């Protein structure tokens, strides 16, 4: 039984969960600031580390509609190297995942006043109860990363960049995922205790913020393990490829 349990645990760590994250930048101060949260020390994955708000895709994210749509180039980049069973709707759902997770972890609403279509799926009931519909048109895909094998959890995470002006309401409550939250200048972000991949993507986000034309031309960075190497490929606009 012990061996079987260990085998089951090993298989669990190899499951790759899809996830959505949003990097919010506040441009109202002399120096731009990014929102970070510090994960609880008892978390299995990245305990006590500072991270961007976001989290795991939920099937309920497919059952809601945004009040707007992603830019075509961002939607196309999201479709790159998708699992075979995924559709265009799944790409949009990843942005909705980021909206929902930001709300759960920080209490911040990214949306517009309005009623969500009934029935509202369970994961979205708290958001809908405030009288808002999710908004995603301002999201820009700036990176994608798959957690390497051997970690306690593995995620295929899409990182979106957005101006903090997309925040329309702060409900003042969160799910306790973070022990503290804060807005930090770029240099202050670099001084935080960040996971290695977060540090890499922070630089990608800063570059996308400062030189959006360069990112649009070169493509979206995609980090993943390839044998013994950890690769950084660029997802060119409208590119498609096999799932790693």
Regions found by a protein language model. Give the residues of each.
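N-terminal leader/linker segments that precede catalytic domains of diphosphate-processing enzymes
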Residues: 1-244
């Amino acid at each position: 039984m012990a061996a079987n349990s260990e085998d089951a645990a090993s298989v669990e760590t190899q499951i790759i969960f899809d996830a959505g994250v949003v990097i919010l930048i506040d441009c109202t101060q002399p120096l731009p600031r990014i929102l970070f949260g510090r994960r609880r020390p008892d978390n299995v994955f990245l305990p006590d580390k500072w991270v961007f708000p976001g989290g795991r895709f939920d099937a309920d994210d497919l059952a809601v509609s945004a009040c707007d749509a992603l830019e075509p180039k961002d939607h196309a980049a999201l479709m790159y190297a998708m699992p075979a069973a995924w559709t265009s709707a799944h790409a949009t759902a990843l942005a909705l995942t980021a909206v929902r997770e930001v709300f759960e972890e920080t209490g911040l609403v990214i949306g517009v006043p309005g009623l969500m279509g009934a029935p509202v799926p369970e994961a979205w009931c708290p958001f809908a109860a405030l009288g808002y519909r999710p908004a995603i048109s301002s999201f820009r895909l700036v990176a994608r990363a798959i957690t390497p094998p051997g970690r306690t959890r593995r995620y295929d995470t899409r990182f979106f960049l957005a101006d903090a002006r997309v925040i329309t309401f702060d409900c003042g409550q969160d799910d306790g995922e973070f022990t503290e939250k804060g807005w930090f200048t770029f240099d202050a972000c670099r001084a935080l205790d960040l996971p290695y991949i977060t540090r890499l993507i922070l630089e990608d986000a800063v570059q996308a913020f400062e030189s959006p034309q360069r990112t649009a031309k070169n493509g979206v960075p995609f980090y993943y393990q390839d044998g013994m190497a950890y690769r950084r490929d660029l997802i060119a606009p409208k590119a498609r490829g096999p799932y790693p």
